[in-house]
UniProtKB/Swiss-Prot annotation:
Name listed for the protein in its UniProt record: Cytochrome c oxidase subunit 5B liver, mitochondrial
Function: Component of the cytochrome c oxidase, the last enzyme in the mitochondrial electron transport chain which drives oxidative phosphorylation. The respiratory chain contains 3 multisubunit complexes succinate dehydrogenase (complex II, CII), ubiquinol-cytochrome c oxidoreductase (cytochrome b-c1 complex, complex III, CIII) and cytochrome c oxidase (complex IV, CIV), that cooperate to transfer electrons derived from NADH and succinate to molecular oxygen, creating an electrochemical gradient over the inner membrane that drives transmembrane transport and the ATP synthase.
Protein's cellular compartments: Mitochondrion inner membrane
Topology term for the membrane: Peripheral membrane protein
Native source organism of the sequence: Oncorhynchus mykiss
Length: 33
């Protein structure tokens, strides 16, 4: 959804990416957000 509200699917994907990056960095996912 370019320039619009992201769909639930896009939001979930973004959240999964954040969690994966946080896990790789050894940080708490909530600290990244």
């Amino acid at each position: 959804a370019v320039g619009g509200i992201p769909t639930d699917e896009e939001q979930a994907t973004g959240l999964e990416e954040i969690v994966m990056v946080a896990a790789q960095x050894g940080a708490d996912x909530y600290d990244v957000m």
